[in-house]
Amino acid sequence: MLKFGAPTMVEMETLEQAVQVCTELNLDFLELNINFPQYLLKELDVKKLRDLSEKHGIFYTLHLDDEMSIADFNPYIAEGYCKTVYDAIELSKTLGIRKLNMHMSRGAKYTLPDRVIYFFEAYEKEYLERIRAFREECTKRIGDADITICVENTAGFLPFQQKAVELLLESPVFGLTFDIGHNYCSGDMDEAFILSHKDRLKHFHIHDCVEGKKDHRTLGTGVLDVKRYLALAEELGCTAVVETKTVESLKQSMDWIRRDA
């Protein structure tokens, strides 16, 4: 049975409100997003998280910072992001969180008259060395814990990012998140790549899209074949965040899933 979760939303001002939405909509989990100030790792109350989880029968996944530049050439920046991941791993061990969702930063870019070059692309060897070191440290820190860091597609994986993702996937502690709305908005840049690693696909972000590359829409109101992606997620035993941006849209999306999907 496919397990559905709620994303963190601006209108959910407290953890209690977010858990209440999960309970009211009969969702299985909440994806805690540490981009939000109240969900910064240092702000999280482990006892409260555990108590609410046990009381309401839900679990958590964790969405890491959007700008997760773990291979930045500036060591101070890279160290900060890497430490965030390492701290998230320790929190996940404490709370039994099994999936961490992570973006892959494209990094800074250099604009020429005829094209744009990304520094990670221009200095790919050094970039991949940093990715490899990050992979090894995460593998060591996770150890035999049941935790997977799931790399999410965002604006379309560029070739140097695909190489980095494949390096990460050499470790069993890494997997993939398939964001179907981001894939559509990038012109289907990522689906073939992700499905070529289908055995490592662990997590989905599900939302509909409308023409004009506008995503995070209510399920059933846009152009995506959402049913096909839900079937794939269920086939692979994945979890799925219904990643709308308002509670009302989330409610309508869950109604659509239970009625039409």
Positions of predicted regions on the chain:
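Active-site acidic/histidine proton-transfer and metal-coordination neighborhood
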Residues: 54-55, 74-175
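Hydrophobic "anchor" residues on beta-strands that sit immediately upstream
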Residues: 27, 59, 148, 175, ...
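Active-site beta-loop-alpha junctions enriched in small/polar residues
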Residues: 7-11, 33-37, 65-69, 105-107, ...
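N-terminal pre-domain/capping segments
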Residues: 1-87, 93-95
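Catalytic-core regions built around general acid/base machinery
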Residues: 44-57, 126, 130-141, 193, ...
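Soluble or luminal CAZymes and related metallo-dependent hydrolases
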Residues: 14, 41, 45, 80-84, ...
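Histidine-acidic metal/acid-base catalytic patches
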Residues: 2, 12, 16-23, 71, ...
